[in-house]
From Swiss-Prot:
It comes from Bartonella quintana (strain Toulouse) (Rochalimaea quintana). PANTHER family: RIBOSOMAL PROTEIN S9, SMALL RIBOSOMAL SUBUNIT PROTEIN US9M. This is Small ribosomal subunit protein uS9. GO terms for cellular component: cytosolic small ribosomal subunit. It holds the Pfam family Ribosomal_S9. The keyword Ribonucleoprotein applies. Belongs to the universal ribosomal protein uS9 family. One of its GO terms (molecular function) is RNA binding. NCBIfam families: PRK00132.1 (NF001099). Keywords: Ribonucleoprotein, Ribosomal protein. One of its GO terms (biological process) is translation.
Length: 161
């Protein structure tokens, strides 16, 4: 690099370089040695580890079929939302291990993990999934109980006399 001795030389050099506005971030495919995309998803107290590979639409959670693990139809619908959003219902096999939290939090964590894994497998899916809000980590957690209160915000019954 050339020696810069004055402020005018520095401004001349920096004006020639590209601005950051023109640079577009490039998302590349991230796969492991077996051709799988790996991602972690979180929701409430649940953490899900998700592996996505080409297949026939089989979803396994903690070594169980997903419809056996999540008995409620609402939870199964939450789980399948990212795959349905990109119209690839039967193109990927999904293996997930999920710990912590309740069933609702676990379903949300697996959905978040599937969405991230889909973007790692095929970066073009990112715009669709981002627009639907599947890539955003839902940071809402239960508010802690405070001392002097019955619950987080509920006070004990007040009596004037």
């Amino acid at each position: 690099m050339a020696e810069i001795n004055s402020l005018s030389e520095f401004s001349a050099v920096t004006s020639l370089t590209e601005t950051h506005e023109n640079v577009v971030p490039i998302h590349v495919q991230k796969l492991d040695s077996q051709g799988r995309a790996y991602a972690t998803g979180k929701r409430k107290g649940a953490v899900a580890r998700v592996w996505l590979k080409p297949g026939f639409g089989k979803i396994t959670i903690n070594n169980k079929e997903f419809d056996k693990y999540f008995a409620r139809p609402v939870l199964r619908m939450i789980l399948r939302q990212p795959i349905v959003a990109i119209n690839r219902d039967t193109q990927f096999d999904i293996i997930a291990t999920v710990t912590g939290g309740g069933l609702s939090g676990q379903a949300g964590a697996v959905r978040h993990g599937i969405s991230k894994a889909l973007t790692y497998y095929e970066p073009e899916f990112r715009t669709i999934l981002k627009k639907r809000g599947f890539l955003t980590r839902d940071s809402r957690v239960v508010e802690r109980k405070k001392y002097g209160k019955a619950k987080a915000r509920r006070s004990f019954q007040f009596s004037k006399r």
